[in-house]
From Swiss-Prot:
Source species: Sulfurisphaera tokodaii (strain DSM 16993 / JCM 10545 / NBRC 100140 / 7) (Sulfolobus tokodaii)
NCBIfam families documented for this protein: PRK04136.1
Gene Ontology molecular functions: structural constituent of ribosome
Protein family membership: Belongs to the eukaryotic ribosomal protein eL40 family.
GO biological process: translation
Gene3D superfamilies: 4.10.1060.50
Lineage: Archaea, Thermoproteota, Thermoprotei, Sulfolobales, Sulfolobaceae
The entry's keywords: Ribonucleoprotein, Ribosomal protein
Protein known as: Large ribosomal subunit protein eL40
Record GO cellular component, one term: ribonucleoprotein complex
Family annotation (Pfam families): Ribosomal_L40e
C-alpha cells in the first residue's frame, strides 16, 4: 500500500534514509555521527537515498 499523504511520506523518508552506514562493520548510525557506535571507526557513508528495485 503506497503512501499518498506527503506529510507521512516525508516522515517515513526521514526515518529510513537519514542514517549513516559504517563501511567496516555495516552498522547503522545517526546522521550526526562521526564515529561508528559498534566498532568506533570513522569510516562512515550516508545511506543510499533510493529504494531497491523489486525482483520479479
Amino acid at each position: 500500500m503506497p503512501l499518498t499523504d506527503p506529510v507521512k511520506l516525508q516522515i517515513v523518508q526521514q526515518r529510513i534514509f537519514l542514517k549513516k552506514v559504517c563501511r567496516d562493520c555495516g552498522a547503522l548510525n545517526s546522521v550526526r555521527a562521526t564515529k561508528c557506535r559498534r566498532c568506533h571507526s570513522k569510516n562512515l557513508r550516508p545511506k543510499k537515498k533510493e529504494l531497491p528495485a523489486k525482483k520479479g
